[in-house]
Structures are given as structure tokens and as C-alpha cells.
């Protein structure tokens, strides 16, 4: 019945939201531990075994902080902007397939909140809309550093959203769909190349698109080495300079949830998602997403921050032409049927 499907969708969405929040909390622990190892330190190890309770302690500390509103801020917009960023962040996970249906008490439970035929466009649109929380927060703060950080973020998203979308056109051409379910099914086929039989993961047929997607995704999420909107040495803390307490935590939560959603999306689009060598399952998706999350941390530990002119030049002079080249090559391959794609 329709009402049963509706209730099941709400329940799956509620569970997914709580899982994302839990993963976000322990993503901070994971990042600090990995960075510490790379820098020959120990990392958080005092609160609980191996420091596993550190995210809880950090959350309690943030909730206990005073929520300060600057005197020259636009109060209403200042208060709402972080909530907007946080509310939009987990919505992208709603269209990511976490597996096939699950039978429980005679009811089929799809491991997917919403199956829409333009799922990838939906995720890209959310990425574009998410910048409104940043620009509104920077503008409403009444601080020049905050405003400059917000303007940087807007320009960065406009530049790299274009690269991100164009990098996926090759995947759309090969799969013939914008639905993540259809893209996942196409990758579950086997690819026969002479004596070799390989999974039809798009990282094999679209290596350039994969590299472009990774670079653009790091820039979209404002992570190092593309963290220009919150560059401490130039802008204090960028667009959230004036935020404190739990409102600061909303921006913090949104950034890490965006990282997790982008990692899940990359794993689904290029690495077969739940597809694995022995048996399909959500654990394969989790393992692949963990690889991308480690990639984020590794970049932060190894690369210095780009200059702003370098950041914009990379997008418009290097990545955009390469994305257009990849579309042309993929179209020719599809037209001529090379490699039985």
C-alpha cells in the first residue's frame, strides 16, 4: 500500500540521517588519528579507549559554549544560515542505493530513501543550493573576513560545479541514464577484454573523468588544499568567523556530512557501489567510501593551500578543457562501439 511505502521511506530516511550524524562524529576522530600518524604524533587518546569518546566530549563542549550574535549582524539571517547549510547536507544521501530490498515482517524495505530518475542532477543541484547557507552567513555576520570568505566559496562552487557536472557526462553516456540505480546495474555487468574479464566499473573506462571528479569534489567541499573560503592565515576563519557554540557546529557538521555524501557518490558512480568480488553488500560501499575519506585526509596532510588565482586558473584553464575532451572521446567510443561499452 502507498501509506506503507511512505512510512517505510520515512523510517529509512530517519535511520540514514542518524547513521550519517554518527559517521560524521567519528570522521573527525578518524581524521585526527590519521593526521597524527602522518605527522608522527599519537592523536586523541585520552577520552575513552583509543580516544573513541573524543567526538562526544567535543560535542558537549560546543553545546556548552555561548551563542554570540555580533551587534552589527543581520540577526535573523545570521541565525538561520547555519541551519540551512546543515539541513541541505544529508539530503544527497537519500538517492544513494545501499543495497537491494530487505524483507522484514513480510514488508519489502528498499535500502534507498528515494529512487528518482535524475538522481545525479538532484545531488548536483543540492551542492549548488548549499552555498546559500555560506553566502548568507558571511553576509549577515557584518564582518569583512566573513563576507570575503563567503564570496570566495561562491566563486569556487560556481567554477568547480561546472567541472563536477561535466566530468560525469561520460558516465551518463555509457550508462544511458541519470539514475544511480541504473548506473549501479550497468557496473554490475562484466567487461570482457580479450582474455581478461573485469568488472564494468566506470573507473576503468572513465579514468580521466574519475580524476576530474575527485579534484572537483575536494574543491566543492572546501577541503584542503582548496579550503580558500576559510583560510586561517588570510581570513581568520572565513565565513564562520563570527559563529560560536552550536551554530558553529552546524557548519562543521555540514562540511563533514558533505564529505561522506560525496565519498558515497564517488563509490557508486565509479567503483560499483555495493558491487564486490564475493557477494554484494553495503560493506563494500562503506569500504570504498572509506578509501575516499582517507584520500581527503591524505590531501590535507600532504599538500599546501593553493593561491586563489591558482585555484580559479586550475578550474577554467585545465580541468574544464579536460572535461570537454573526455566528453568528446567518450562520445566517439560510444558511437563506434569500441571495447563493447
Swiss-Prot record:
A GO molecular function held by the record: oxidoreductase activity, acting on NAD(P)H, quinone or similar compound as acceptor
GO biological process: aerobic respiration
Subunit structure: NDH-1 is composed of 14 different subunits. Subunits NuoA, H, J, K, L, M, N constitute the membrane sector of the complex.
Subcellular localization, as worded in the UniProt entry: Cell membrane
Enzyme Commission numbers on file: 7.1.1.-
Source superkingdom: Bacteria
Organism this protein belongs to: Thermomicrobium roseum (strain ATCC 27502 / DSM 5159 / P-2)
Assigned protein family: Belongs to the complex I subunit 1 family.
Reported function: NDH-1 shuttles electrons from NADH, via FMN and iron-sulfur (Fe-S) centers, to quinones in the respiratory chain. The immediate electron acceptor for the enzyme in this species is believed to be ubiquinone. Couples the redox reaction to proton translocation (for every two electrons transferred, four hydrogen ions are translocated across the cytoplasmic membrane), and thus conserves the redox energy in a proton gradient. This subunit may bind ubiquinone.
Transmembrane segments: 6-26, 76-96, 118-138, 157-177, 198-218, 252-272, 278-298, 313-333
HAMAP family on file: NDH1_NuoH
Name listed for the protein in its UniProt record: NADH-quinone oxidoreductase subunit H
Catalyzed reaction equations: a quinone + NADH + 5 H(+)(in) = a quinol + NAD(+) + 4 H(+)(out)
Bilayer disposition of the protein: Multi-pass membrane protein
Cited InterPro entries: NADH_UbQ_OxRdtase_su1/FPO, NADH_UbQ_OxRdtase_su1_CS
Amino acid at each position: 500500500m502507498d501509506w506503507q511505502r511512505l512510512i517505510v521511506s520515512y523510517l529509512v530516511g530517519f535511520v540514514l540521517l542518524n547513521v550519517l550524524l554518527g559517521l560524521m562524529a567519528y570522521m573527525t576522530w578518524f581524521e585526527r588519528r590519521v593526521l597524527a600518524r602522518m605527522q608522527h604524533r599519537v592523536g586523541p587518546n585520552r577520552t575513552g579507549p583509543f580516544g573513541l569518546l573524543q567526538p562526544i566530549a567535543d560535542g558537549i563542549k560546543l553545546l556548552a559554549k555561548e551563542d554570540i550574535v555580533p551587534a552589527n549582524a543581520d540577526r535573523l539571517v545570521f541565525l538561520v544560515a547555519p541551519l540551512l547549510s546543515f539541513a541541505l547536507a544529508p539530503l544527497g544521501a537519500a538517492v544513494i542505493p545501499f543495497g537491494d530490498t530487505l524483507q522484514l515482517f513480510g514488508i519489502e524495505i528498499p535500502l534507498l530513501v528515494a529512487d528518482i530518475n535524475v538522481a545525479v542532477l538532484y545531488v548536483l543541484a543540492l551542492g549548488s543550493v548549499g552555498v546559500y547557507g555560506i553566502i548568507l552567513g558571511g553576509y549577515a555576520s557584518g564582518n569583512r573576513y566573513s563576507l570575503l570568505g563567503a564570496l570566495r566559496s561562491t566563486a569556487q562552487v560556481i567554477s568547480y560545479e561546472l567541472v563536477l557536472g561535466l566530468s560525469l557526462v561520460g558516465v551518463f553516456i555509457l550508462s544511458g541514464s541519470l539514475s544511480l540505480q541504473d548506473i549501479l546495474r550497468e557496473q554490475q555487468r562484466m567487461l570482457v577484454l580479450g582474455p581478461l574479464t573485469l568488472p564494468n566499473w566506470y573507473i576503468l573506462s572513465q579514468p580521466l573523468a574519475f580524476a576530474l571528479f575527485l579534484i572537483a569534489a575536494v574543491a566543492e567541499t572546501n577541503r584542503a588544499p582548496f579550503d580558500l573560503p576559510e583560510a586561517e592565515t588570510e581570513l581568520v576563519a572565513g565565513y564562520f568567523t563570527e559563529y560560536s557554540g552550536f551554530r558553529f557546529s552546524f557548519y562543521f557538521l555540514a562540511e563533514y556530512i558533505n564529505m561522506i555524501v560525496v565519498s558515497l557518490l564517488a563509490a557508486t558512480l565509479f567503483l560499483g557501489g555495493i558491487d564486490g568480488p564475493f557477494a554484494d553488500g553495503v560493506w563494500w560501499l562503506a569500504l570504498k567510501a572509506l578509501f575516499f575519506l582517507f584520500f581527503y585526509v591524505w590531501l590535507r596532510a600532504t599538500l599546501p593551500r593553493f593561491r586563489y588565482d591558482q585555484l580559479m586558473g586550475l578550474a577554467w584553464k585545465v580541468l574544464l578543457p579536460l572535461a570537454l575532451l573526455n566528453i568528446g572521446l567518450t562520445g566517439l567510443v560510444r558511437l563506434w562501439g569500441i571495447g563493447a561499452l
